Amino acid sequence: MRKSFYTWLMTQRHPKSHDPVAILADLVFEDTTFPKHTDSFERVSRYLEDEASFSFNLSEFDRIWEDYLAH
């Protein structure tokens, strides 16, 4: 079973980094309503588009998701 996207993303946190994956990880870490237990692209993507309390470039999210799948 694959780790949840959130669990993987938290391994990418680097608060002083300007790398998009680190930025997203820090934003998600602060977001208490992020879906933490899913590995569904549809669920996470929909959350980022419609529900997140922050905005993030979804093209960058697609690239980050590909990195997640590769791990």
From Swiss-Prot:
A Pfam family found in this protein is: YozE_SAM_like
Q: Which domain of life is it from?
A: Bacteria
Q: Which family does it belong to?
A: Belongs to the UPF0346 family.
HAMAP family under this entry?
UPF0346
**By what name is this protein known?**
UPF0346 protein SMU_1621c
Q: What is the lineage of its organism?
A: Bacteria, Bacillati, Bacillota, Bacilli, Lactobacillales
